[in-house]
Amino acid sequence: MILTFKYRIKDATVGKYLDRHSRSVNAVWNHCVSVQRSIERRYIATGLKERWPTHFDLVKIATGYAATLELHSDTVSQICKQFVISRNAARHAPRFRASGGPKRALGWLPFIKRAVKLDGAHVVYRKRKFHFWKSRDIPDAIKTGCFTQDARDRWYVCFQCEVPDDLPTGNGEIGIDLGLKTLATCSNGDTIPALQHYRQFEAALAVQQRAGNKRRVKAIHAKIANVRKDQLHKASTKIARENQLIVVGNVSAAQLAKTRMAKSVLDASWSMLRNMLEYKASRHRARFIEADERWTSQACSDCGAVSGPKGIAQLGIRHWVCSDCGCSHDRDVNAARNILFVGAERRPPVEEIPAL
């Protein structure tokens, strides 16, 4: 599989060179946008359909940009390639990338393996060395990469490398019920606590926002993101190592983000956890399944009878007893067990689903 290895550029003084290169990247990107929009304007004016420019068409049109803007020719090719991918995947045409102002695009400088040279903890691009913190070894099978900039104007170098999918995995099977009070409850009774990272720093963030200290506001937001990703990485790695089957409920964060629970839902980062579990399961050669979680919290995981608490009014009931078999359940653990049953296709979570 393809993994991205990200390292922070160590020498802050080279930022001006990367800033200059990123402005050149924006110039090539904006030229591609101009070509695309000129075709659209001609179609509106004349009604004659023209073929959209392909990757090779854009590279041919951008001939000479590499020498003029001091970019590697493969960088120009990668920009054109990414433009075509974005145009075909997005609902709207790609927009111009601003190099300045409040809505400027963050720096981005793509390359392929032959455009750079690795020298220990240095990467050489167009005869200039960029020193980075080499926190872990870089695999030899580098495919592509890029220099990227974050909101705090810090630069990173990223390498996309091909790594084998042969990490050892356990023999367990686990179902995971995502929630807000507890971030994730597993079918074996384990839980991942909801640490509410944003709420922990909310007061400090409000103070700096009122003071107009943009630098500290960016630093606090970065701290929140780093702490959140650290927790999710540790939890997802542990689950992927110990289980050969991982089943997660398909709760929609996008829909719940439109409700009054939006802050808690976005702070929980369910989608990020699911994505981590998916690619880590693939690397450990485990199965990852998103299961339909309807009725899983109301159905008894022992007999399948729908006798659990229903609706928002009974959401506060965390423990209940099945009226059919008399089994006592923790609401979230019971839901996680039913999610595992659905994903493993051993039996339906309920015997009879009542008609709506």
Question: Which positions does each model-derived feature cover?
Answer:
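Nucleic-acid substrate recognition interfaces
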Residues: M1-L356
